[in-house]
Amino acid sequence: MKLETHNIAVGAGLISLDVLIWDWQRVPISYYVGGTCGNVMMILSYMGWDAYPIARLDGTKDGMRVLDDMKKHHVHIDFVSTQDGKTPVIVQRNFINKDGLPTHKFESRNNIGRFYLDFKSLTLKQANGVIERIDFVPKVFFFDRVSPAILKLATTFKEKGSVVFFEPSSRGGN
């Protein structure tokens, strides 16, 4: 395994498609990579890092929009699968509140009651496949969701000398 001297980050967790809508238009005005992990990978790439998300998306139009946005912003998609995952969608509805100020709200269901936020974590088999294929040691491993596969990645990268950064997805009792 070769050691890299430049900044490389690997991330796992919530990578979604953010759909922004102005309330009075009722049609999407933009589609961007979102989710905590997705945002971190995009920001680090913008700052000159090599960013490698590890994710299970799907091959739908939403999944392809996520991949296209990542590629457009030089995020490496080597470890993003579109075979058996789901692409979470987060809808942000922008509007002017009663005081005349711009604000927004997030929606978790579509107009027929289906949840947008379908997230599928990596499997242990997929994590082991990434560990076998990866030929560098990242400076940072970032994650925002906990699963056996993501913990396996965190442990492996820590043992190789990476800084492991966990940002919990919510403040819960556990």
Model regions and ranges:
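Conserved beta-alpha-beta core of the PfkB/ribokinase-like small-molecule kinase fold
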Residues: 138-174
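Alpha-helix C-terminal capping segments
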Residues: 41-50
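Flexible, charged surface loops at secondary-structure boundaries
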Residues: 2-5, 46, 130-138, 158-159
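Positively charged, low-complexity intrinsically disordered leader regions
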Residues: 1-25
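Conserved N-terminal subdomain of the carbohydrate kinase-like
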Residues: 17-21, 25-26, 49-140
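Short catalytic helix/loop segments, enriched in acidic residues and glycine
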Residues: 24-42
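Residues at the starts of beta-strands that form the adenosine-phosphate
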Residues: 8, 50-52, 76, 162-165
